[in-house]
C-alpha cells in the first residue's frame, strides 16, 4: 500500500484548500494511505513514513514561504541521505495570476531534488489551455472546476507513481498513458 504525505503552509487558507484537494486526489487511488499535515505539524517521522510527498506553499514574492523553507532547512536537513528516491511534486497559490506560483513550484522541486527526491510534472490538461506541468497552481483559492481538478489530478498522479514505482503496479503506467481524459480539446 502506497503512503502519501501532503504537507502545506498557508496564510489565508487558500493553499490549505489546495492541499485538501491534492489529498482527495491521492485517496482516489485504492490502497493509498494519505496524511495531510500543516508544515508546523509535519515531522521527520512523517517524511520517513511516506513513499511520496506533495509539498504546497503560498507564493511569497515569487518564492516559497519562510515556514516551508525552514522545514526544508531544519526538518529535512536532518534526513540528508535517508530520503533519496522518494517521489514528490509541488503546488502553490499566489495572490494573482503572474504572482510567481510556477516559480514557487520550481523552487520546491529544486529543494526536493537536492534531497534526492524523484520529482515530476503532469502532462495532462484539465481544461482548455489549463495544465500543471510544474505542479498545480492557483490564483487565490481553487474556485473553478479546472483549478480543483488540477489539484486532485496532481494528488492522484503522485499516488499512481508511488503505486507503480514503490508497489510495483506497472499496469497503471499504460492506463495513465492511454487515458483519453488527459487532454482537453
From Swiss-Prot:
GO CC terms, sorted: membrane
Tree of life domain: Bacteria
Any Pfam family the entry gives: Flavodoxin_1
Any GO MF annotation of the entry: FMN binding
Cofactor(s) required for function per UniProt: FMN
InterPro entries the record matches: Flavodoxin/NO_synth (IPR008254), Flavodoxin_CS (IPR001226), Flavoprotein-like_sf (IPR029039)
PROSITE patterns on file: FLAVODOXIN, FLAVODOXIN_LIKE
Occurrences of domain Flavodoxin-like (ranges): 4-159
Record keywords, A-Z: Electron transport, Flavoprotein, FMN, Transport
Role noted for this protein: Low-potential electron donor to a number of redox enzymes.
Family stated for the protein in its record: Belongs to the flavodoxin family.
Name the record gives this protein: Flavodoxin
Gene source species: Aquifex aeolicus (strain VF5)
